[in-house]
Amino acid sequence: MSKTIAINAGSSSLKWQLYQMPEETVLAQGIIERIGLKDSISTVKFNGNKEEQVTDIPDHTTAVKILLNDLIHLNIISAYDEITGVGHRIVAGGEYFTDSVLVDEKVIEQVEELSALAPLHNPGAAAGIRAFREILPDITSVCVFDNAFHMTMQKHTYLYPIPQKYYTEHKVRKYGAHGTSHKYVAQEAAKMLGRPLEELKLITAHIGNGVSITANYHGQSVDTSMGFTPLAGPMMGTRSGDIDPAIIPYIIERDPELKDAADAINMLNKKSGLGGVSGISSDMRDIEAGLQEKNPDAVLAYNIFIDRIKKFIGQYFAVLNGADALVFTAGMGENAPLMRQDVINGMSWFGMEIDPEKNVFGYRGDISTPNSKVKVLVISTDEELCIARDVERLKK
């Protein structure tokens, strides 16, 4: 038996989950927030308990020390060396990595080099890797890449219809994201359906604050909605998703608040989507409250959101030449029955029917009717477990 910790580090946060492996038992989980700021917060949840402390955590190395000391103080572990593996979630792995890898200095440097593809994620992830290597230099350390699952896409799918020099010289292409989540829920869907993953055609819809849809053919990603960056695809919580690129120079010329392309991209990433259109919130619960109040901006934002998700699902039915199941996962995918119902409404031609009672009452699993030709599943994603499994796989 061994203990493995899954890490999701950002620029100012470090989310973690500790597992007993190979049993896959969660021993504890938590998050350290406001790294580098005053009044940092460390939260640990274990055995139904919750411990929280407020202190100053200037950097990721200090954060890791506090995390490990908390585990000892709370008797979750008795010594550092009980942890034999650590897995780090990396958003952007570019074309360097088609699978999870053991960490060495070259891997860390490549993660840092790819920060342009994920400026909010890769630098923090690299800092987290270095912190663990400094404090626990002898444990198995693994990088798990969000886009690696999508590296099975064919060239005609991942290349953009622009001059090829931008790919050959600058590696501009579709990379995708949320791959760890899409991989996990596809595996769970196969178990739920009682069929080998290698014979299934699945459409997996990761719908949280970030939204991505993936076409999965026999266990492999053949297309996905996120692109060169996670900005592409359907409308999201604060991201616009796909727009006509000519809009960017047009609005820069006319909006004095947008000084350059970086400002415009920031607006598309952080001030658009549900929040930007509604003017209310990026949270679907607030949007649904707006629907009840018949707020016209909430109604408009919601309708755009549903429309864009439907279109990607329809595309992937075409890409796969039909599907065995549609899987909803992540925050909204798992917890927004109205959204699921409205996505499915009007898609009866594809052979999908959901049971209203199963859908509304938070049923996890198959929410489709017995007559539904395409099964509709709700599956809780578990990216952390997927990371821990990859650590165990690479230990052997």
From Swiss-Prot:
<feature type="site" description="Transition state stabilizer">
    <location>
        <position position="178"/>
    </location>
</feature>
<comment type="pathway">
    <text>Metabolic intermediate biosynthesis; acetyl-CoA biosynthesis; acetyl-CoA from acetate: step 1/2.</text>
</comment>
<dbReference type="InterPro" id="IPR043129">
    <property type="entry name" value="ATPase_NBD"/>
</dbReference>
<dbReference type="GO" id="GO:0000287">
    <property type="term" value="F:magnesium ion binding"/>
</dbReference>
<feature type="active site" description="Proton donor/acceptor">
    <location>
        <position position="146"/>
    </location>
</feature>
<feature type="binding site">
    <location>
        <begin position="283"/>
        <end position="285"/>
    </location>
    <ligand>
        <name>ATP</name>
    </ligand>
</feature>
<comment type="subunit">
    <text>Homodimer.</text>
</comment>
<feature type="binding site">
    <location>
        <position position="8"/>
    </location>
    <ligand>
        <name>Mg(2+)</name>
    </ligand>
</feature>
<feature type="binding site">
    <location>
        <position position="89"/>
    </location>
    <ligand>
        <name>substrate</name>
    </ligand>
</feature>
<dbReference type="GO" id="GO:0005737">
    <property type="term" value="C:cytoplasm"/>
</dbReference>
<dbReference type="GO" id="GO:0006085">
    <property type="term" value="P:acetyl-CoA biosynthetic process"/>
</dbReference>
<feature type="binding site">
    <location>
        <position position="383"/>
    </location>
    <ligand>
        <name>Mg(2+)</name>
    </ligand>
</feature>
<keyword id="KW-0479">Metal-binding</keyword>
<dbReference type="InterPro" id="IPR000890">
    <property type="entry name" value="Aliphatic_acid_kin_short-chain"/>
</dbReference>
<dbReference type="InterPro" id="IPR004372">
    <property type="entry name" value="Ac/propionate_kinase"/>
</dbReference>
<keyword id="KW-0460">Magnesium</keyword>
<keyword id="KW-0418">Kinase</keyword>
<keyword id="KW-0067">ATP-binding</keyword>
<keyword id="KW-0963">Cytoplasm</keyword>
<comment type="function">
    <text>Catalyzes the formation of acetyl phosphate from acetate and ATP. Can also catalyze the reverse reaction.</text>
</comment>
<dbReference type="InterPro" id="IPR023865">
    <property type="entry name" value="Aliphatic_acid_kinase_CS"/>
</dbReference>
<dbReference type="Pfam" id="PF00871">
    <property type="entry name" value="Acetate_kinase"/>
</dbReference>
<protein>
    <recommendedName>
        <fullName>Acetate kinase</fullName>
        <ecNumber>2.7.2.1</ecNumber>
    </recommendedName>
</protein>
<dbReference type="GO" id="GO:0008776">
    <property type="term" value="F:acetate kinase activity"/>
</dbReference>
<dbReference type="GO" id="GO:0005524">
    <property type="term" value="F:ATP binding"/>
</dbReference>
<feature type="binding site">
    <location>
        <position position="15"/>
    </location>
    <ligand>
        <name>ATP</name>
    </ligand>
</feature>
<comment type="similarity">
    <text>Belongs to the acetokinase family.</text>
</comment>
<feature type="binding site">
    <location>
        <begin position="331"/>
        <end position="335"/>
    </location>
    <ligand>
        <name>ATP</name>
    </ligand>
</feature>
<dbReference type="GO" id="GO:0006083">
    <property type="term" value="P:acetate metabolic process"/>
</dbReference>
<keyword id="KW-0547">Nucleotide-binding</keyword>
<feature type="binding site">
    <location>
        <begin position="206"/>
        <end position="210"/>
    </location>
    <ligand>
        <name>ATP</name>
    </ligand>
</feature>
<feature type="site" description="Transition state stabilizer">
    <location>
        <position position="239"/>
    </location>
</feature>
<keyword id="KW-0808">Transferase</keyword>
